Amino acid sequence: MPRTRLIVGAITSALLFSSHAFAADQRFNNVVVFGDSLSDAGNVSLILDPALQTTQRFTTNPGSTAAENVAKALGFSSTASKLGGTDYAYGGAGFVNNATTLPIENIPQQLQQYLAATGGKADPRTLYQVWGGANDIFYLTDTYTDANVIAAGAAAAAQAEVKLLGNLQAAGAKYVVVYNLPDIGKTPESIAAGAAAQSGGTQISLVYNNVLQTGITQLSGSGLNIIPVNTFALINEVVANPSAFGFTNVTTPACGAGSSSVVCGPAGSTSGLYLYHYPAGADQTYLFADGVHPSTAADAMLGQYVMSIINAPGYASLLAEAPLASISAQNRAIRNQMLADGQGSDTRVFASIDYGDQRFDAMSGSPKTTSNNVNLTIGADVRFTDNLSGGVAMNVGQHNADYSGGGGYKLQDISGLGYVTYHQGGGYIGGYVDFGQDNFSDIERRIQLGNYVRNETAKADGNHMGGGVTGGWWFDFSSLRTGPFATVEWQTVKVDGYSENGIDSSAMWFSRQQRDSLVSTLGWRLEGHWQAGNTMLSPYAEIAWNHDDKADPRAVTAGLNSMPGSFSLVGFTPDKTWGTADVGLSAQFTQALSGWLGYSGRFSDNSQKYNSVNVGLKYAF
């Protein structure tokens, strides 16, 4: 296959495509890159001219590569290793054979250089990015004409990449972004060479990717967190519908035929080592900078794509958190009935509606999310003896959640529970158990890819089971009563694994989740009783301290539908300790009918905020 060569006589550029900014990401402590020109942050440009004030990339300069864009989105700087940075990639580098006459390190040597500087250890909290293989193929097509020899060489190069990934894991790495090969047959260089070159480029890319994917499957099974990036599929999607992604040209280079993008800059620019120039705006509308390398806009799009994959487990993690709010509203209504039992209330039926505004704060692993929650609880309570009562209830909850930036989910929770209360003098104690089924619909993950907004949708099922013990003591002072209370509640929420409906490059699957909760509550309650005409009014207030012993960081496993490889990342992490406050007013309208209006709020919680209003009626027999 013919290739675009660097006119400065030294380098064969042999790579294809690469291509929200946040504070430093809490999931990772650094980003390290190994690869070729698709990820080269300036190493080759410094070989060509060590005096360069600004390093140049294989793109429409002064753009950045996809790997750099990923590092930036995570809050890190990825600079060339020749400047002391963590981007070891060199244009022309391969896994087995380089495709350049420049004195550069191949990709395995890049890893060895890094390990030599770290004492042979890879950092388990560092995110590694690996992208290569194209130069091996370019070397093979320049050296051989036998298709079988070329295919065998491509397979050997892919096996060398798998070996490198295994060596990274053996050195201690836990997280690696692995880019597969884009479709070489879709590059301007292949298009210009004719139909045979296009077909051959596509086929050899598939040979490489198939071997790589087999290795990825094995490495994922051995515990390496591989974040798969299907550039082959994504670039084909762009080529099939360029305008949707914001491109007007996907077949010719922005820098011109025969150009090399590492020495290509904007029209009229006199700074830098620029031998070629691209027209104004072409860096944003052309898919390719030169015969095989992506433009600035393409690199930006690829960075968005990678970040959508990395962030996806955080979106999914909120699903297992959501039912706890419905359970809390339900059990709050039930505990109020148990309090009434502690005062010797009659057999009755009751209904309560709770409207809650829930806000999950943004974290490095999950998005800011708002949820409007409505819960209806209906039940019946029977007075067995003067001191013993019990009841059953059913709860239907509907939550509509929206992620910041778009997307969200709907939760329908249907629960049943039973409870029993014993009271004697000023003391009371009770217990309850609950079980519920959850249905998540309209799960939507919104992804920005250049100008294109893609919505990945899914649905999932789940369930929860739990129970609690509560008790307290009343001190009576005429028309006032007050006293302490304590509750211990255990819940287990399970969400079944699910896959998004799409078959495109960004559609993903997510593993089964389990969120355990063990909340201890200590509080103080105050209640008054005053007659207002024919109505008995009972204002109340309570404040409580809560601690969830199981509110630990929880990882969600995910992967692409279209490519092997899986990874587990921590998503939403709830606070372990928070406060709650409740105030309200109940009224006895007749001997049989009473009602209440109340407010419940959550405070001193660094992970979420919750405010709700509840209203209810009960009818005694």
List each model region and its residues.
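Short, Φ-rich (hydrophobic/aromatic) sequence segments
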Residues: 11-15, 325-335, 545, 599
